[in-house]
């Protein structure tokens, strides 16, 4: 050992003379900490320099004897074990310490243990800790003698703890790390060593740690070292290498070296090293590396890991960039090993590493996203493709070419410096000139072409083949229906063979897009030219011969040559499609994915190191996708494409006989069937994508069910006996009984575990005392005299009688669910647990921002807001009646005991029963009678444990601590015997073990800025759970004026001393480079706290989850899933391992777990959200994890901490882009070779949103986040490199779900367009008498009719498809419920959903998903939306619901509904009823799911609010107004101006950057134009007088009608606005002096006129159409679409940016432009505002009419008696007896409400009457008018009015060309000629 230590001691110049040690013996322990705080002037904090005044932690200047230069060795130079005073051995590094050290408690020498052991009267067996009731002096807490026993207890440990400390201190001095960071990382490292060495020898523990962090095959550092070819840099230097291609000479040498490598004997290291001298291949480099690593001494290994941890611990944002950190570490290591460092005498100043190395990179990262304006950070208006993000920065270090780009200020390249000098010059690097984009996240749909190219090939090519085969009329010469003549065979083959050309074209486009996304200057960019030319050749091969076939001869000539060529080309096309479907784009025709070359090894290592599937998993993956596509292709062909065959044949060959349009005659109307056919095919094409997803869901569900039976999870598994065998299973699966001596009876051990579970449920008030008695094991006298025996509860046996529900639990209770799942889960295969002593240490990490910690009394017993009808406590009592009953009984017992203790029992006896009932009222009402804090606190806790609070999460996950103590005690009975009756000593021992193995870390970034009540709650948490660790951000003012404040990451727990200012003194306080919150918040919050995690694994938990004792007992098995517990004692650096063998090593990175959504059964929406989460998190995760498609979804996944933290952390953090931050960590793990598993037997609780709005906020966040994911490089790597089966799994499990929603909405819109055109076609045509069973060559009657019936029947097919696609979404929920809870529960839940209209909600949610995705990909602006945590009992005002959902769903629903109305009236079909239901959902869902929407009074008060919402905000700013909503909607497109004037209205504005014009044209204008064109064509056709005998003079001018009705309202509005603007400018300021409402009056006039004008032109259209309702409808629809198009163009192309304040709007109406803070823009703004107001007036009219229509449609419901009660039952699933009472108002309030209701009720019915009049009036008039209105007009306006009473039947004898023989005999055909 000494030889190893020698060089190290040479480096440290720490004298260990006796004088230095003796001088401190009295007052200080061996590490220089004051032993008796009374003797020390203050606790030494390295952050406070001597002489500076005490900082906010209230420190005195450090003691004189302390303030010595640490290089003299007086700080830690004492010999070990010197501090004998306390018999304790503490280090200032450890988390424990004597009083006065940061790891100690503030309560002096004793503190109350956070959890007491089970079994004692005060024991805590529950998630609710016990407060009070015991004397804190009773338990004297002797702190553990050794904080890291597994390492220090073993005499074999290769390095002593003192030597490790010396290493950390030495590194800190030499490289300038912070003192607190060093202490933190030392503790971190020791906990890691302790955790490992508890299950292996210390030597192996250190070796395996070094292998994981630095040198092993799975270590990221080693992978990077070889990927970036740093072995070459170390050998010959990058500056001496020509980076890039190998020369011919080098290639020859490479072959020779490879041969030498194969011949070498790996056992003889020396000989092999000599042989491979000069060989730069990966195998040789790997051999050299292993040999080098194998020779390291333990001290050097410690030094390597310590240096990495110290770098990582202070890297703050750089932790997200794993390889950048590796580079910094490499530079530091080179410097450390060099003589330059050894010879340096004075230490580096503290903080040098942070300030010199990390902060410049931090500033670069921050400046990419933010700029400083007036001293505050403002987000730059850059989209992702202009921001050099974390990934771009990181990828610079992947390739030597990138590292070569690093330049210093003086222009020198870093690689030109010697290795040892690089670290010292890192501060001089000009990072701004170094980093660049390595992947452009351009906001475009083209990413989908590249990333998912194989999906398009599989669908578009096959659809082409199916379609071409079934459309013979397109390539048949002179097709005649009566003959049904067939095309040439060659043409049939050739047109199908074009599918191969389509596939090649897709690949070419994908490659071109890739060219634009991956900048060529990045060394990792693939060389695409070769692939591009190859693709062009394949394209030519596929297309050339087909051109030959079609051009070779006329379509009347049969040619054998053409036939043969066409047939061969068909098979070539099939081969092309199969090849392109299977081959990833990344591997096409290039060496990019080949392992043989070192050129792209970095991209393979970091973006394509997928863990392969093996054995059954691989075959299962293949089977899933073969089944899906076999089913899909056959079903699509027979159901979708064959049904098109007849419509294609008819529509493609029919020409219409119509008069046409005044301006262009019959050009358009003749081809109407072909236009309809195009629309039908387009709609069917979208459906072709949809049904793949449908089959994926079905097959996935089937496989998942199969697996659940196989695992024995299902309740339907016949052999289950889950309760009878439960005790045996607890013994075999929960307890680690293998190493245990047999002398203890299993029953004794099982009983302790079982009783603890039952008692914990009793303490959580889930079980009443009588239930508990039946469920516990009891001690009863034995038959043997004097002995006692255990009696098992009858529960285990009587389960089979099926009467257990009533006897043992409350029916359908939480206790029943938990015990059932526990029993069920133990019947599945579970990894064997290790003894507690040997289990690894792990941490639970929870980020917290502003979520509720603990509910306040006010929140519980006061109504939420004016719209709520119930207090939270009332609602919770209704949801959990049994638990409330138990709680009240418990409280009463407590109150009686307290009363008895105070001596009042005599009075109690005298009270009669009635009085006691009255006395109990307060208990049952609010849970307490006395307002003493201990009673109110109990009620607060009871409510908090049933809401989504942080307290619930912490109390739930602190059960790990209880579980560990319980298991340790049960499995080690000798410990209990050893302590005898000393309960305190036993508890201390158990505490020690729990603290060693489990940590709970909450990242409360805002703690330092908490309000008093939040601080009080946080302090309450720390007192209840002293072992809870809280990391927070601490801020200090800057040292010099004008600089940024200093920000620290600090850590406290419940043992930290409380200072005078009420705050706690932190254990660790590490300075950061600046504010760490640069992204969307959550990932940065996790990252800053990550340095405080301990152990080998982290469980990531959100602040609204829960856990249970019985689940925590399984923790050892869950951790065993990482496959690292039974490590064989192998040397990872053994020289025999070949490079090829090690590439197969893929560690488990993430273990996912199930979630139980505890908000289910609290109403329909909560239950839908819960069902969705269950199927996604359980049913699908089960199959996905097996076939390698599961990613990481945040909670409640366990992660392999070393694997993830060395690869960029637990989430990604670029603002906007990484919106769903968790999933990126999963993709990152998958790309870098980690495996992701799913654990079936363990589940946590999770809260979900319960309100309509909050659920859809979450939906919006997920949808927008998916839009951002589509742009991300992870999708690019996965999509272009995964093997086909894994790619399909990934696609359909993640983006496919969202694109499927998008396709559903797209197909719905396409269908509406098709329906409008098809209905107008059917409306105007005389249909044939159609019989599908007759041959198609029969003569159609009447002669000259149009046989459109098959096309009309297609609507039925389409409806059925959409219907199935929709209902299939419910299959997984039902199946999941079926297998987990049985048939009855599944049926019950399904019918509850149906009766509660949950399908309506599903349709709406699907629209929100697709709308969020669409708008994100077009406009951007995705932001983090915090999801709701409360209960949805408030009635939300109509105006808020309307403004929230109008843009995303209601407008689209209303437009489609008008089109559907036209379709229904023009040509009625029963299947259209389904669309009426769907579209009603889009319009009415927000109001149907609004609590108390139909309460009479509330409805009309809400109407009042709506009217006021429409009219306010024009005189002065109002937070909630129509104009505000319109401006915000518009700003998403136009963006905001930067100029601020400090007005209140600016606060609400937020950030919105201007959308890219190209995107707006693609996403807003073009679809709008297509829609307008589609409606316009249908409108002109329905007016084209089909079949009417006319002359050219009779052509109608329907186009002019559209022009008039579209533009006239806009022109009138413009006139009104000019008038108002003139009025306001001239007289507004004058009026303003006396009238306060000038603006409102002006706006009111303009808005009123706009509404009247739009309604008037609706009637005008009716008149122009000669009062024909059908034609008027399509006319109005067309006008609306045309106006939309005009307004979109105006907004996108004419409007400048919006002001953040509201001044321009108010100035327009009041005329006060001056003094509004607009500066010179006051001159240009009026014209901009005028343009905006033109659009606004039409929008106002639309919102006024649409809002009223929605309100009027609710009238039939409002007038139903007791509707509110039925509606509440539907929403909340509360029985009528448990209904929420109506609110109670004072008399004055009641009178006021009644008056308002009368007033607005009258207004409502008045508007209703006017609307009715507008419809009834023209309808009545139409019956009175018989002659053509426009007869008297001539010229252009001659046929402005549609002629009436014309006959359009020109069939049979009415035909103009009728001859008796025509169409009654078969015409003769041309004869064929044949060429040989």
Swiss-Prot record:
Keywords: Cell membrane, Cell wall biogenesis/degradation, Glycosyltransferase, Isopeptide bond, Membrane, Mitochondrion, Phosphoprotein, Transferase, Transmembrane, Transmembrane helix, Ubl conjugation. The modification Phosphothreonine is found at residues 269, 272. Disruption phenotype: Cells are hypersensitive to immunosuppressant drugs FK506 and cyclosporin A (CsA) due to the inhibition of calcineurin phosphatase activity by the receptor-drug complexes and is dependent on calcineurin for vegetative growth. It confers a slow growth phenotype which is partially suppressed by exogenously added Ca(2+) and exacerbated by EGTA. Simultaneous disruption of CNA1 and CNA2 or CNB1 is lethal in FKS1-1. Disruption of FPR1 or CPR1 results in the loss of hypersensitivity. Changing residue 329 to N: In 1132; temperature-sensitive mutant; no gross alteration in beta-glucan content of cells. Residues 476-492, 553-563, 643-678, 1380-1444, 1491-1560, 1623-1643, 1696-1802 are extracellular. It is an enzyme of class 2 (transferase). Belongs to the glycosyltransferase 48 family. Component of the 1,3-beta-glucan synthase (GS) complex, composed of two alternate catalytic subunits FKS1 or GSC2, and a regulatory subunit RHO1. Interacts with RHO1, which is a GTP-binding protein. This is 1,3-beta-glucan synthase component FKS1. The lineage of its organism: Eukaryota, Fungi, Dikarya, Ascomycota, Saccharomycotina.
């Amino acid at each position: 050992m000494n030889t190893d230590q020698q060089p190290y001691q040479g480096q440290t110049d720490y004298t260990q003379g006796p004088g230095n040690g003796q001088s401190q013996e009295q007052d200080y322990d061996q590490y220089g900490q004051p032993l008796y705080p009374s003797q020390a002037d203050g606790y030494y904090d390295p952050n406070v320099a001597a002489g500076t005044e005490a900082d906010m932690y209230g420190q005195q200047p450090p003691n004189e004897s302390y303030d010595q230069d640490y290089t003299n060795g007086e700080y830690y130079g004492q010999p070990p074990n010197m501090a004998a005073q306390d018999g304790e051995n503490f280090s200032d590094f450890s988390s424990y310490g004597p009083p006065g050290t940061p790891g100690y408690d503030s309560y002096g020498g004793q503190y109350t243990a956070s959890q007491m052991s089970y079994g004692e009267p005060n024991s805590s067996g529950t998630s609710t800790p016990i407060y009070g009731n015991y004397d804190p002096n009773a338990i004297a807490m002797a702190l553990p003698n050794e904080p890291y026993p597994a390492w220090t207890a073993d005499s074999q440990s290769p390095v002593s703890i003192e030597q490790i400390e010396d290493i950390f201190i030495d590194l800190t001095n030499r490289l300038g790390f912070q003192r607190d960071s060093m202490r933190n990382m030392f503790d971190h490292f020791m906990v890691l060593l302790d955790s490992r060495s508890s299950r292996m020898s210390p030597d192996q523990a250190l070796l395996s740690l070094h292998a994981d962090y630095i040198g092993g095959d799975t270590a990221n550092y080693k992978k990077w070292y070889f990927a970036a070819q740093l072995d070459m840099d170390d050998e010959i230097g990058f500056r001496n290498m020509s980076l890039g291609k190998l020369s011919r000479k080098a290639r020859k040498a490479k072959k020779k070296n490879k041969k030498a490598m194969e011949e070498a004997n790996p056992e003889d290291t020396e000989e092999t090293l000599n042989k491979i001298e000069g060989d730069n291949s990966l195998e040789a480099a790997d051999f050299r590396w292993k040999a080098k690593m194998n020779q390291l001494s333990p001290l050097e290994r410690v030094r390597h890991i310590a240096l990495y941890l110290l770098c990582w611990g202070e890297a703050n944002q750089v932790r997200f960039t794993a390889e950048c950190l590796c580079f910094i570490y490499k530079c530091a290591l080179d410097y450390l090993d060099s003589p330059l460092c050894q010879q340096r005498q004075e230490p580096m100043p503290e903080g040098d590493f942070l300030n010199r190395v990390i902060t410049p990179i931090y500033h670069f990262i921050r400046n990419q996203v933010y700029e400083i304006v007036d001293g505050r950070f403002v987000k730059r208006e850059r989209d992702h493709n202009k921001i050099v993000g974390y990934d771009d920065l990181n990828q610079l270090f992947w390739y030597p070419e990138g590292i070569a780009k690093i330049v210093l200020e003086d222009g020198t390249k870093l690689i030109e410096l010697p290795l040892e000098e690089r670290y010292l010059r890192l501060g001089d690097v000009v990072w701004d000139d170094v980093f660049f984009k390595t992947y452009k996240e351009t906001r475009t749909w083209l990413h989908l072409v590249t990333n998912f190219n194989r999906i398009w090939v599989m669908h578009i090519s096959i659809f082409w083949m199916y379609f071409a085969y079934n459309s013979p009329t397109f390539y048949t010469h002179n097709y005649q229906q009566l003959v049904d003549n067939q095309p040439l065979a060659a043409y049939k083959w050739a047109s199908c063979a074009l599918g191969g050309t389509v596939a090649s074209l897709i690949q070419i486009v994908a490659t071109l897009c890739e060219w634009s996304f991956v900048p060529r200057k990045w060394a990792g960019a693939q060389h695409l030219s070769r692939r591009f030319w190859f693709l062009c050749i394949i394209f030519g091969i596929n297309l050339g011969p087909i051109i030959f076939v079609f051009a070779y001869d006329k379509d009347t000539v049969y040619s054998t040559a053409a036939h043969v060529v066409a047939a061969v080309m068909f098979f070539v096309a099939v081969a092309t499609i199969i090849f392109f479907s299977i081959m990833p784009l990344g591997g096409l025709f290039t060496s990019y994915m080949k392992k043989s070359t070192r050129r792209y090894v970095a991209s393979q290592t970091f973006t394509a190191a997928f863990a392969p599937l093996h054995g059954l998993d691989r075959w299962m993956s293949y089977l899933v996708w073969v089944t899906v596509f076999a089913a899909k292709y056959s079903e699509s062909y027979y159901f979708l494409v064959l049904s098109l065959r007849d419509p294609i044949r008819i529509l493609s060959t029919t020409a219409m006989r119509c008069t046409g349009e005044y301006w262009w005659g019959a050009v358009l109307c003749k081809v109407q069937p072909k236009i309809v056919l195009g629309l039908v095919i387009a709609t069917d094409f979208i459906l072709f994508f949809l049904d793949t997803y449908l089959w994926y869901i079905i097959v996935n569900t089937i496989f998942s069910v199969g697996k659940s039976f196989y695992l024995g999870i299902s309740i339907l598994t016949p052999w289950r006996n889950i309760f009878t065998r439960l005790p045996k299973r607890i013994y075999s699966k929960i307890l680690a009984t293998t190493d245990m001596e047999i002398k203890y009876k299993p029953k004794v051990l099982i009983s302790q575990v079982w009783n603890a579970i039952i008692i914990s449920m009793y303490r959580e008030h889930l079980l009443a005392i009588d239930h508990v008695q039946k469920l516990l094991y009891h001690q009863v006298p034995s038959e043997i005299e004097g002995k006692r025996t255990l009696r098992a509860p009858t529960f285990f046996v009587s389960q089979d009688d099926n009467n257990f529900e009533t006897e043992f639990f409350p029916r359908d209770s939480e206790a029943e669910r938990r015990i059932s799942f526990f029993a069920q889960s133990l019947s599945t295969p579970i990894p064997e647990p290790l003894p507690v002593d040997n289990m690894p240490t792990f941490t639970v990490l929870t980020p917290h921002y502003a979520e509720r910690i603990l509910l306040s009394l006010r929140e519980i017993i006061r109504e939420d807001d004016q719209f709520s009808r119930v207090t939270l406590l009332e609602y919770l009592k209704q949801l959990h009646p049994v638990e409330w009953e138990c709680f009240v009984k418990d409280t009463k017992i407590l109150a009686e005991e307290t009363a008895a203790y105070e001596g009042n029992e005599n009075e109690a006896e005298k009270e009669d029963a009635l009085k006691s009932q009255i006395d109990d009222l307060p208990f049952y009402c609010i849970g307490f009678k006395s307002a003493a804090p201990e009673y109110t606190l109990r009620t607060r806790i009871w409510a908090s444990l049933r809401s989504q609070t942080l307290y619930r999460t912490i109390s739930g996950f602190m059960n790990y601590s209880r579980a560990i103590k319980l298991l340790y005690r049960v499995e080690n009975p000798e410990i209990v015997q050893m302590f005898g009756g000393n309960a305190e000593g036993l508890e201390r021992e158990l505490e020690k073990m729990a603290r060693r193995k489990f940590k709970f870390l909450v990242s409360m970034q805002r703690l330092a800025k908490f309000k008093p009540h939040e601080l009080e709650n946080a302090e309450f948490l720390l007192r209840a759970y002293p072992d809870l660790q809280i990391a927070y951000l601490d801020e200090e003012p800057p040292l010099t004026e004008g600089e940024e404040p200093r920000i620290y990451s600090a850590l406290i727990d419940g043992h930290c001393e409380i200072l005078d200012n009420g705050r706690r003194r932190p254990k660790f306080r590490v300075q950061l480079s600046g504010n760490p919150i640069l992204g969307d918040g959550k990932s940065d919050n996790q990252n800053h706290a990550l340095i405080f995690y301990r152990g080998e694994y982290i469980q990531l938990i959100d602040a609204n989850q829960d856990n249970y004792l019985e689940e925590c007992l399984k923790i050892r098995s869950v951790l065993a899933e990482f496959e690292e517990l039974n490590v064989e004692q192998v040397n990872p650096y053994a020289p025999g391992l070949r490079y090829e063998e090690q590439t197969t090593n893929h560690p488990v990175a993430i273990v996912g777990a199930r979630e139980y959504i505890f908000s289910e059964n609290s109403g329909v929406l909560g239950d839908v959200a819960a069902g969705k989460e269950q199927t996604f998190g359980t049913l699908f995760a089960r199959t996905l994890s097996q076939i390698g498609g599961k990613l990481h979804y945040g909670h409640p996944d366990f992660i392999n901490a070393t694997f993830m933290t060395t690869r960029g952390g637990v989430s990604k953090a670029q603002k906007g882009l990484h919106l769903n931050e968790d999933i990126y960590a999963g993709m990152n793990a998958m790309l870098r070779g980690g495996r992701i598993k799913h654990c079936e037997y363990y589940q946590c609780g999770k809260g979900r949103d319960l309100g309509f709005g909050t659920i859809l906020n979450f939906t919006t966040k997920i949808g927008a986040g998916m839009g951002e994911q589509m742009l991300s490089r992870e999708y690019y790597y996965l999509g272009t490199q995964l093997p086909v089966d894994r790619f399909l799994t990934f696609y359909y499990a993640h983006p496919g779900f969202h694109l499927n929603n998008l396709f559903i909405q797209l197909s719905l819109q396409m269908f509406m367009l098709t329906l409008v055109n098809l209905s107008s076609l059917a409306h105007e045509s005389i249909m044939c008498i159609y019989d599908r069973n007759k041959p198609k060559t029969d003569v159609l009657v009447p002669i000259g009719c149009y046989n459109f019936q098959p096309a009309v029947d297609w609507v039925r097919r389409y409806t059925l498809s959409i219907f199935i696609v929709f209902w299939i979404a419910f299959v997984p929920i039902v199946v999941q419920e079926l297998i987990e809870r049985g048939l009855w529960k599944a049926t019950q839940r399904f019918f509850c959903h149906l009766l509660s209209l949950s399908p309506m909600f599903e349709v709406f949610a699907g629209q929100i998903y697709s709308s969020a995705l669409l708008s994100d990909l077009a406009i951007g602006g995705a932001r983090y939306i915090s999801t709701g945590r409360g209960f949805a009992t408030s009635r939300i005002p109509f105006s808020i619901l309307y403004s929230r959902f109008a843009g995303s769903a209601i407008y689209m629903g209303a437009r489609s509904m008008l089109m559907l109305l036209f379709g229904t009236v023009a040509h009625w079909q029963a299947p259209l009823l389904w669309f009426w239901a769907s579209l009603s959902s889009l319009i009415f869902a927000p109001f149907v799911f609004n609590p108390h929407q139909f309460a009479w009074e509330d409805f009309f008060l809400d109407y009042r609010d709506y009217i006021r919402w429409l009219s306010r905000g024009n005189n002065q700013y109002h937070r909630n107004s129509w104009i505000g909503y319109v401006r915000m909607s518009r700003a998403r497109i136009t963006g905001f101006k930067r100029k601020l004037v400090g007005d209140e209205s600016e606060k609400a504005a937020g950030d919105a950057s201007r959308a890219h014009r190209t995107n707006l044209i693609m996403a807003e204008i073009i679809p709008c134009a297509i829609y307008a064109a589609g409606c316009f064509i249908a409108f002109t056709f329905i007016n084209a007088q089909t079949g009417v005998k006319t002359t050219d003079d009779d052509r109608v001018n329907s186009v002019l009608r559209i022009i008039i009705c579209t533009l006239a309202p806009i022109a009138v509005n413009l006139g009104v606005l000019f008038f108002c603007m003139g009025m306001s400018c001239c007289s507004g300021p004058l009026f303003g002096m006396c009238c306060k409402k000038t603006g409102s009056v002006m706006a009111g006039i303009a808005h009123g006129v706009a509404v009247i004008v739009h309604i008037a032109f609706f009637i005008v259209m009716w008149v122009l159409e000669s009062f024909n309702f059908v034609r008027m409808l399509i006319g109005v629809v067309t006008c609306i679409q045309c106006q939309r198009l005009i307004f979109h163009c105006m907004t996108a192309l004419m409007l400048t940016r919006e002001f953040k304040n509201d001044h321009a709007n108010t100035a327009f109406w009041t005329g006060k432009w001056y003094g509004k803070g607009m500066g010179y823009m006051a001159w240009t703004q009026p014209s901009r505002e005028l343009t905006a107001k033109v659009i606004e007036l039409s929008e106002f009219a639309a919102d006024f009419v649409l809002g009223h229509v929605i309100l009027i449609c609710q009238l039939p419901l409002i007038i139903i008696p007791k509707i509110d009660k039925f509606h509440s039952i539907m929403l909340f699933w509360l029985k009528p007896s448990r209904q929420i009472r109506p609110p109670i108002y004072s008399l004055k309030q009641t009178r006021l409400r009644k008056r308002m209701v009368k007033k607005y009720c009258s207004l409502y019915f008045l508007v209703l009457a006017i609307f009715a009049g507008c419809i009834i009036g023209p309808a009545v008039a139409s019956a009175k008018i018989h002659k053509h209105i426009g007869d008297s007009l001539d010229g252009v306006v001659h046929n402005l009015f549609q002629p009436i009473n014309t006959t359009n039947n020109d069939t049979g004898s009415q035909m103009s060309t009728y001859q008796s023989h025509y169409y009654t005999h078969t015409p003769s055909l041309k004869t064929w000629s044949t060429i040989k």
